[in-house]
């Protein structure tokens, strides 16, 4: 695991230079915002979900992002087919279990994705990760939830079971893999007032994972960059509407030097 400031910064540089193609099967609520975020950071998004074409699309992509935000049977089939193709090609698959505790249908879909596919990175909020880990967490809507009794244990349990990097995002972000944890403290409270920020972050993690084989470094780098963009946007915003526009501008314009100066990371071992 290489979490030096220089290594994390280089991943951002590589995203902008290589412009990776990120195939995102996301929800219809946030698809435009997700694509805009990827485009602003320098990646090339493609939002295809038709079962008839996902194999072809994944074959030309550098990473695959699966989002459970607005699930239906055909979309789940497309996710599974795309995931199998990505696995066969060695492309990283990133999974966002949006609202997994809200219904039995979502929970069963998430479990099938985790059992049938080799997932590289899972990103969710506290309730979502708690639900996947079987440790509870009271859901109060898609984006707000109480924490599971032991957040670190929940993330560690899920990471051990799936062999994936697990990212738990909220007021304080946690990334867990291989007995180690990284706390990321970049971000701003205004980010919680804008719909779809989690979906955008998961897609951004996909862009970073497309150019960085160290998946915990890719995840930490993307989360820190996203949080720093939120900090910059908050300086110019007057409310959620202006924040949304300022955030996209910050994703586009945040420099490697600003990224280096602003990182707020703490590493720790999981007992």
How would you label these PLM feature ranges?
Residues 1-44:
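Glycine-rich phosphate/adenosyl-contacting loop at the front of the ribokinase-like
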Residues 4-15, 164-186, 258-260:
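Acidic-glycine-rich active-site phosphate/pyrophosphate-binding loop
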Residues 6, 228-271:
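Charged C-terminal helix
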Residues 37-90, 95:
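Active-site cofactor/substrate anionic-group-binding motifs, chiefly glycine-
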Residues 75-124:
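Glycine/small-residue-rich loop that forms an oxyanion/phosphate-binding "nest" at active or ligand-binding sites
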Residues 106-181:
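Conserved phosphate/ATP/ADP-binding segment of small-molecule kinases
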Residues 131, 195-224:
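Short, small-residue alpha-helix embedded
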Residues 156, 184-195:
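Short pre-catalytic strand/loop immediately N-terminal to key active-site residues, enriched for Gly-Thr
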């Amino acid at each position: 695991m290489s979490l030096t400031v220089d290594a994390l910064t280089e991943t951002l540089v590589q995203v902008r230079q290589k412009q990776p193609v990120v195939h995102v099967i996301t929800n219809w609520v946030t698809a435009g915002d997700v694509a805009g975020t990827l485009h602003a950071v320098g990646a090339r998004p493609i939002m295809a979900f038709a079962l008839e074409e996902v194999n072809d699309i994944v074959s030309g992509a550098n990473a695959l992002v699966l989002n459970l935000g607005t699930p239906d049977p055909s979309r789940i089939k497309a996710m599974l087919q795309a995931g199998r193709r990505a696995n066969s090609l060695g492309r990283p698959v990133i999974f966002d279990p949006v609202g997994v505790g809200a219904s039995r249908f979502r929970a069963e879909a998430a479990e099938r994705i985790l059992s049938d596919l080799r997932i590289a990175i899972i990103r969710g909020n506290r309730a979502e990760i708690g639900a996947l880990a079987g440790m509870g967490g009271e859901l109060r809507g898609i984006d707000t939830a109480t924490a599971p009794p032991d957040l670190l244990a929940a993330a560690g349990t899920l990471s051990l079971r799936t062999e994936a990097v697990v990212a738990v995002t909220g007021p304080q972000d946690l990334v867990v893999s291989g007995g180690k944890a990284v706390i990321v403290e970049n971000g701003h409270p205004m980010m919680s007032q804008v719909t779809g920020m989690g979906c955008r972050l998961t897609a951004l993690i996909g862009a970073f994972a497309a150019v960085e084989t160290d998946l915990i470094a890719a995840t930490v780098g993307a989360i820190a960059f996203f949080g720093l963009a939120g900090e910059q946007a908050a300086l110019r915003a007057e409310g959620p509407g202006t924040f949304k526009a300022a955030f996209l501008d910050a994703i586009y314009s945040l420099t490697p030097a600003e990224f280096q100066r602003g990182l707020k990371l703490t590493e720790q071992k999981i007992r």
